[in-house]
């Protein structure tokens, strides 16, 4: 029974939950108070009507707008204000359901969606001020009314692109002192009027041609921008906000970086910070790349440099999207007219198009008129393009590469590989020329005070020129921990969990720890996690500069996902020992032939397969194995580019896509076996193996493990299966000489157990299995890397006893945000997050997991089924159970006939190409809860299915594309518990 609740640190979900409890009278009844903010403050900031009234009361301008609660009223208001209009639903996250409408048709569509997604059924319709500058202020206020600004930030993209999808610069670069002070005063007035205690983020639109501005919105909580502002300044916003909520004032809270100043000092920046979004279009080839007021980015990178050009170049190469400079996307085939039109397109490639326009001699005015991007930024991009020209001139023999030119290229952070490519020399030659002329990276501190006071726990960024501030600290052994870079589909926050826990364990073992990472959203980039933090891109050159200065005794790559693994070879060339499993053993697990030899030696079966390089070889392999086959590139994470092929056409299509993503590694073709998928994370000390638990995927093989519902402990496998899995895990861990972690995926087909994949590193299930078994896997693996054994650490080797409850990990998808993406599941990962349901019974755990993932049924009790011919028999039983819990079933012709023939009442609906009312009318009519759509495999897939699934997601209908998921969902509906039991996961710790 808590005394108080702090809702401002849990994002929009925290605020919404606090408001629902407040509205239901729960806090009053239980005598619990909200701290950090009041319910009235949240309402004033989040309720669009109250926000407008509050701003008008203190004379702060807002764009002309009105609140609507139905589509008809919305269209009337839009007419009155005049198109284009911006639509913003109340109480939603990341601009969900919002957008810019240029005409009544678009307006009606966005309104319908926005009203459905808003918790209170409200949408704000306002004048569109797209093209104005978007500026943000991060402000702090304590209970005594003291206020400071922590940081101000500027979006390179003008208003109209969600700040989460925009390139953001801190501090703002294009404001004059008058504008800066005007907005600062406004932000301090707003936070004081709203009565916020803690952190708050205010977003402004500023007219570039006058001093006119208006307030876009206020987040009365710690937000994504707060995380960026914290990392950009070194001022720990969330920590200070929590202390303020407990009653401290700003002048009582010490600055943790300097240990001398207080939180009432405004941070000073003597450097430039750039944030770039990491967008998921590499996973969703069909998605619309345009950016608007709904956020699409899955993550972000941040870089720091003494100049904007350098910070931008660092951010570009931190994205890990095969881009390293402004030449990375090629627009040379566009005519000048087309290029000018394309500058209008707001998407993730826009700065590369601007660079191309500058190469062709477009004037700054031409570019500014179309993009509304400030002249200052266009000029900085021009400086980068001029350097390209200078380096190309060296390549063509017109100039020679002088030390001055090289020093200037490095000052604006041109990496050696790009300089080598443009000048036609080798990277080694460039590096030698640099070193001979003393052109080396030096490291500067982020110390919150522009070097006014000494810093106790600074972090570092590199630049060229000046003196080095990263001093040698202690005489202890040093370990370099490589982070996992930006959050993207397939490599999420799970790897940051591993990096942080391993850093702490190394510290406890007496090591000096050094983290390299570039993601402002993560815990690993907090200044107090490691002894030293370098905020740098994770590329061989950037890491080598750190190694030159720090000279670590070893590096650990098994906790940072594929990002860290990819740096293994480069680290070994630098002479840095890889701690834990040896690099050649990691290679053996990825190299098909070596791995097959190990399996043969251990007498472990795997699905038959071949390694190929061309489409012809792939088809030949598929004919030998017999379709269906699984085709995938080697060395990828998150199943990128993986597909189930059922014909030669599928293979041709697949190889075409692979060639787009520059494939130098071979392609693997495997026989596809339909069975239960099992996953194990284990720790090995070279002799003994510890297996915390066995997880089972609800979806059968063919759906990526990251998109499957995962159950611990595994439910329906035999003791014989379990013994085989444990035996194979032990044999493989020993054969690969694993020291630390290993992740293995199996297929169970009756009594047979096959190996699908082995990764001698941490995996995305590590935090889940650690939390639900109470076994601290990462600290144990780290201590084993340091030389301890499993027995020494007090654990009995082998499979640990299963818990007496069930824990289910449910994937969470963001399909409604990513327009045009196909939502059907397959071997390529698509989920952007996950949640956990824990209970004493399987059914209750499943129900909690579905609820947690936001799948809340039923509302209308109507559903649509469209199942491919081969699965229709299996679908009958599932349909019968949905009918038994009260569902009315509509189905496409073939499915409806099968269901009716088997005694399940189903109403036949017309296909998409038939006249209305057809399946699409039913979906768009807002009467359907659920669609079960099992698409045909491979090239047989119909475009109709894609259109229906997309429209369903965009109108808020739950869509399942796997019968196993449908079976799980109906099971949870059959067993809906009135009262959910609580399980305190902290009590199960074995640690």
Question: What are the roles of these predicted feature ranges?
Answer:
Residues 1-2, 13-15, 27, 58-59, ...:
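ATP-dependent carboxylate activation and anion-phosphoryl transfer catalytic cores
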Residues 1-60, 69-76, 314-315, 432-604, ...:
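ATP-binding N-terminal substructure of ATP-dependent carboxylate-amine bond-forming enzymes
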Residues 33, 66-71, 254-256, 262-274, ...:
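Internal, active-site/partner-interface "lid" segment
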Residues 35, 39, 52, 65, ...:
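Transmembrane helical cores of multi-pass secondary ion antiporters/exchangers
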């Amino acid at each position: 029974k808590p005394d108080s609740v702090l809702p401002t640190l849990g994002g929009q979900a925290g605020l919404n939950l606090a408001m629902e409890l407040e509205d239901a009278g729960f806090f009053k009844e239980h005598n619990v108070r909200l701290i950090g903010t009041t319910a009235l403050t949240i309402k004033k900031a989040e309720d669009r009507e109250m926000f407008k009234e509050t701003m008008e009361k203190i004379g702060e301008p807002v764009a002309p707008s009105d609140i609507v609660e139905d589509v008809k009223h919305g269209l009337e208001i839009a007419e009155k204000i005049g198109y284009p209009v911006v639509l913003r639903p109340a109480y939603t996250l990341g601009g969900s359901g919002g957008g810019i409408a240029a005409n009544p048709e678009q307006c009606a569509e966005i309104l319908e969606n926005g009203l459905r997604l808003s918790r209170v059924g409200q949408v704000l319709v306002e004048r569109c001020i797209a093209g104005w500058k978007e500026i943000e202020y991060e402000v702090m206020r304590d209970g005594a009314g003291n206020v400071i600004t922590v940081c101000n930030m500027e979006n390179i993209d003008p208003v109209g692109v969600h700040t989460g999808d925009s390139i953001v610069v801190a501090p703002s670069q294009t404001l004059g002192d008058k504008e800066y002070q005007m907005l600062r005063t406004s932000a301090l007035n707003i936070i004081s009027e709203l009565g916020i205690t803690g952190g708050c983020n205010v977003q402004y639109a500023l007219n570039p041609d006058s001093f006119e501005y208006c307030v876009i919105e206020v987040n009365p909580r710690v937000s994504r921008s707060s995380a960026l502002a914290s990392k950009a300044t070194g001022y720990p916003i969330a920590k200070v906000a929590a202390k303020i909520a407990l009653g401290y004032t700003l002048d009582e809270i010490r600055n943790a970086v300097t240990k001398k100043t207080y939180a009432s000092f405004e941070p000073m920046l003597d450097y430039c910070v750039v944030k770039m979004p990491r967008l998921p279009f590499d996973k969703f080839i069909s998605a619309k790349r345009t950016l608007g007021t709904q956020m699409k980015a899955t993550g972000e990178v941040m870089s720091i440099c003494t100049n904007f050009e350098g910070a931008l170049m660092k951010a570009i190469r931190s994205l890990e999207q095969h881009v390293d400079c402004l030449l990375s996307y090629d627009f040379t085939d566009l005519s000048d007219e087309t290029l000018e039109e394309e500058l209008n397109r707001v998407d993730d490639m826009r700065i590369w198009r601007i660079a191309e326009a500058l190469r062709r001699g477009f004037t700054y005015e031409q570019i500014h008129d179309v993009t509304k991007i400030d002249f200052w930024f266009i000029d900085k991009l021009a400086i980068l393009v001029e350097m390209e020209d200078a380096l190309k001139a060296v390549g063509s023999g017109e100039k020679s590469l002088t030390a001055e030119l090289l020093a200037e290229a490095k000052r604006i952070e041109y990496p050696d590989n790009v300089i080598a490519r443009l000048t036609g020399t080798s990277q080694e030659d460039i590096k030698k020329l640099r070193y001979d002329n003393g052109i080396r990276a030096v490291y500067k501190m982020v110390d919150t005070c522009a070097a006014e006071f000494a810093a106790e726990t600074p972090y570092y960024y590199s630049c060229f020129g000046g003196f080095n501030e990263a001093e040698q600290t202690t005489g202890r052994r040093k370990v370099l921990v490589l982070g996992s870079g930006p959050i993207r589909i397939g490599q999420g926050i799970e790897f940051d969990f591993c990096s942080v826990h391993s850093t702490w364990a190394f510290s406890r073992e007496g090591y000096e720890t050094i983290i390299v990472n570039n993601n402002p959203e993560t815990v690993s980039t907090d200044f107090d996690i490691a002894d030293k933090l370098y905020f740098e891109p994770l590329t061989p050159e950037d890491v080598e500069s750190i190694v030159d200065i720090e000279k670590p005794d070893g590096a650990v790559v098994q906790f940072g996902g594929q990002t860290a693994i990819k740096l293994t070879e480069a680290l070994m060339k630098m002479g840095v020992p890889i701690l834990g499993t040896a690099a050649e053993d990691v290679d053996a697990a990825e190299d098909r032939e070596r791995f097959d030899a190990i399996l043969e030696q251990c007498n472990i079966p795997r699905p038959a397969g071949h390694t190929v390089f061309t489409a012809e070889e792939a088809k030949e392999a598929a004919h030998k194995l017999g379709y269906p086959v699984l085709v995938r590139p080697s060395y990828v994470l998150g199943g990128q580019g993986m597909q189930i092929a059922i014909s030669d056409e599928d293979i041709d299509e697949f190889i075409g896509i692979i060639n787009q993503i520059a494939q130098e590694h071979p392609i693997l073709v495997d026989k596809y076996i339909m069975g239960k998928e099992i996953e194990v994370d284990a720790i090995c000390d070279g002799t003994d193996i510890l297996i915390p638990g066995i997880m089972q995927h609800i979806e059968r093989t063919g759906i990526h493990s990251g998109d499957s519902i995962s159950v611990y402990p595994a439910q329906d496998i035999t003791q014989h299966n379990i013994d085989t899995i444990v035996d194979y895990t032990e044999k493989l861990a020993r054969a690969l000489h694993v020291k630390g972690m290993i992740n293995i995926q199996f297929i169970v087909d009756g009594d047979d157990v096959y190996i699908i994949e082995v990764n001698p590193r941490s995996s995305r299930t590590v935090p889940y299995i650690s939390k639900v078994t109470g076994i601290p896997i990462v600290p144990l693996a780290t201590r084993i890397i340091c030389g301890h054994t499993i027995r020494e650490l007090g654990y009995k080797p082998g499979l640990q006893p299963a818990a007496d409850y069930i824990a289910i990990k449910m994937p969470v998808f963001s399909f409604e945000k990513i327009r045009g993406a196909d939502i059907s599941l397959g071997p390529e990962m698509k989920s952007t997050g996950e949640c956990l349901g824990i209970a004493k019974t399987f059914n209750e755990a499943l129900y909690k997991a579905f609820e947690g993932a936001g799948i809340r049924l039923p509302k209308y009790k109507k559903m649509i089924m469209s199942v491919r011919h081969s699965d229709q028999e299996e679908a009958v039983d599932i349909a019968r159970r949905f009918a038994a819990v009260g569902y009315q079933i509509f189905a496409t012709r073939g499915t409806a006939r099968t269901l009716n023939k088997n005694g399940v009442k189903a109403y036949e609906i017309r296909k998409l190409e038939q006249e209305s009312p057809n399946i699409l009318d039913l979906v768009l009519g807002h009467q359907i809860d659920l669609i079960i759509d099992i698409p045909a495999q491979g090239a047989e897939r119909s475009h109709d299915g894609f259109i229906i699934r997309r429209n369903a997601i965009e109108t808020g209908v739950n869509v399942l594309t796997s019968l196993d998921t449908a079976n799980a969902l109906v099971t949870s509906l059959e067993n809906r518990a009135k009262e959910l039991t609580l399980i305190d996961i902290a009590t199960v710790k074995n640690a």
